[in-house]
Each structure stands twice: as structure tokens, then as C-alpha cells.
Amino acid sequence: MLMMLKDILKTLAFSLIPAFIFAFLVILAMPLFQKNGIKKVFKIFFEDIKENKENLYLLFFLMYIFIVFYKTVLQRDFIYSPLENVFGGWKIFMTQYTGLDYQVIGNILMFIPFSLFFCLMKKTQSVKYLLLLSVLFSFLYSLLIELNQLIFSKGTFQLSDIVYNTLGGLIGALIYLAVKLIINKIKEKGAK
């Protein structure tokens, strides 16, 4: 568990600044730099983030997407046979002595924030629609990661990763909906 925590902290330390830069450039787009200059673009960017929560959520979402991609594809070493274990990785318990498989737990946990940020960005009242979109986008992003691992031989393509990542996305959406429900009930009590 300590090793997993160290690995997470190392990933965050090495990818946080590039993730911020990636998200910043995606939100503002390069033409703004050419038209207004860097100093003015930075000023506009931070003023917009202060005024608009949705853009702040988008910033965090894009940064998180980059961090996950960095960890799962870019940071990996070259693997000669990425299809070696396509159907592996389903066991939650490694053996009766070693306990939980941290890779399985990590795959689930990795996509909980993905769905939380995604849900924060969506302005929809339909619970079913939000759940469906969260699961769909978690599945698609996980598939994108696995295909990149396969194409660039950076990690092994595993169907279990897609399933566990999608499950994490579902859990993230359910957490968001539960917190939203609690907040709404508190607001209703306060209004009475």
C-alpha cells in the first residue's frame, strides 16, 4: 500500500505541471496567444476561472485526463508483447496470503475522480442521463488508453482494465449523485 501511495505521489509530482499546461492550452487555444500576447491571455484565463466554476471544473478535468494518460501510457516502458495478457487481471485477490491486488484497486480508484469532474461539468437534471454519460465516457477513455498501450507497446492491453476503469467511473458518478442529493436536502431544510 505504501508503495502504491509513493507511486501515486511520484506520478502527481512529475505530471502536475505538464497537465496544467495541457489543460490551459486546450481551454484557451493557440490563436488567443497570437492575437493578444501571453501576458494578456494569462490574465484573461485566471479571471475567467475565478468568475466561472464550469471552467475551473473543465481545467481540473483536463488536467486529470492528462495525468491519467501520462501514468498509463507515457510513463510506461516499452513492452514487446502488449497482447500477452489480454484476458488477465480479473482476480481481486492475488493469493490468500498477499491480499488485494493493488492494480485492480488502482484501476477502479483511478476513474472515480474522472467521473466526479465529468459530472461537475455537466448541467443536467436527469440522473439516468448523467450516469449513462459517465459510464460511457469512462469506458471510452479507458478504451483509448488501452488502445494506445497496444499501438505504442506501452503496457499490456487488458479487457479487465477497461471493465475496472468503467466501474470506477460508475462509482464516481454515484458518489457525485449521492453528495448532490445530500446537499440538496440540506438546502431544503435550510429554506424551511
Task: Show where each model-derived region lies.
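Bulky hydrophobic segments
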Residues: 1-153, 159, 173-192
